Amino acid sequence: MTRVLAIETSCDETAAAVVEDGRRALSDVVSTQIDIHRRWGGVVPELASRNHVVQVMPVVDEALTRSGVGPEGLDAVAVTSGPGLVGALLVGVQAAKALALAWGKPLVGVNHLEGHLVAAFLAEVPPAFPYLGLVVSGGHTSLYAAHGFGDYRLLGQTRDDAAGEAFDKGAKLLGLPYPGGVAIDRLAKEGDPAAIRFPKAIVKGADLDFSFSGLKTALLHHVKKHGVPEGPALADLCASYQEAIVRALVEKAFRAARRLQFERLVLAGGVAANSRLRAAATARAAEYEGMSVFIPPVRLCTDNAAMIAVAGTHALLRGERAGPDLNADPAWRL
């Protein structure tokens, strides 16, 4: 039995969790900063870092209390050390280093993107390797071939804006509240996704990269020409914009799966909480015999520490250890 405490502070959530054997979350605590950043329309790095300083130890204490596991029952401390906002990452890294030293436990640094890729192992029915992983968030839109824990190969990524960024910037153009992706998803449920024709948000050719800047520009031109609509017309605009983003993600992911002969697709990252993306990916998988799609529960799509504990557990079992010189790496590539 392996029990790992993990800390996650890469952006605007302060999170801690205790996970057993990389499969069972004994606790999973998240302190969100949405209300703090809402007035600014997005995450303010300095405010995020300051709030992490205030919240990190209370969140860790709550995670330990909920799990019923004390420091003596832990096998290691894992922490997100990149990528992310450098100031935010440093808070979590310093806290984890201090706790590991005080408790005499091994320390493991975890890549945030790997955490997303393995979050599905906390679900009731986990995937099996190998699988194709689509990580979609505010800062990343990437396709990975996952052959085992710690064994990933980048297949394609966005050349400009991430899908989550396209949602958030689009929401700002429409005057919608932060977080923008959630607002668009909510309004789109009442709209017609075919009401407005947006350009395909894909890169031409056979490669597996993404591009969303043109789609965002198309929305800007539409708003400049027609203004921001209200009521049903706004719902139609949100649904059409969302559909263009989702279509690009699903088409690229399934193109990669067919070409590389993957039978399993795992959706991960905050945008994987989008209801239309979840439905579209599930529907597309049903069209292909032998193809399965794995989508974690919504709470495991957004930033959390349980997924970091899963990755940390398997890194620990591989013999990986971080020293006292572990530092934040905001540009750490998986």
Swiss-Prot record:
It is an enzyme of class 2 (transferase). GO terms for cellular component: cytoplasm. Its main location: cytoplasm. PROSITE patterns: GLYCOPROTEASE. Substrate binds at V135, V136, S137, G138, G139, D168, G181, D185, N274. Binds 1 Fe(2+) ion per subunit. Keywords: Acyltransferase, Cytoplasm, Iron, Metal-binding, Transferase, tRNA processing. It is found in: Cytoplasm. Its EC number is 2.3.1.234. SUPFAM superfamilies: Actin-like ATPase domain. The keyword Oxidoreductase does not apply. It comes from the Bacteria. It catalyses: L-threonylcarbamoyladenylate + adenosine(37) in tRNA = N(6)-L-threonylcarbamoyladenosine(37) in tRNA + AMP + H(+). GO terms for molecular function: iron ion binding; N(6)-L-threonylcarbamoyladenine synthase activity. One of its GO terms (biological process) is tRNA threonylcarbamoyladenosine modification. Its cofactor is Fe(2+). Fe cation binds at H112, H116, D303. Required for the formation of a threonylcarbamoyl group on adenosine at position 37 (t(6)A37) in tRNAs that read codons beginning with adenine. Is involved in the transfer of the threonylcarbamoyl moiety of threonylcarbamoyl-AMP (TC-AMP) to the N6 group of A37, together with TsaE and TsaB. TsaD likely plays a direct catalytic role in this reaction. Belongs to the KAE1 / TsaD family. This is tRNA N6-adenosine threonylcarbamoyltransferase. It comes from Anaeromyxobacter dehalogenans (strain 2CP-C). The lineage of its organism: Bacteria, Pseudomonadati, Myxococcota, Myxococcia, Myxococcales.
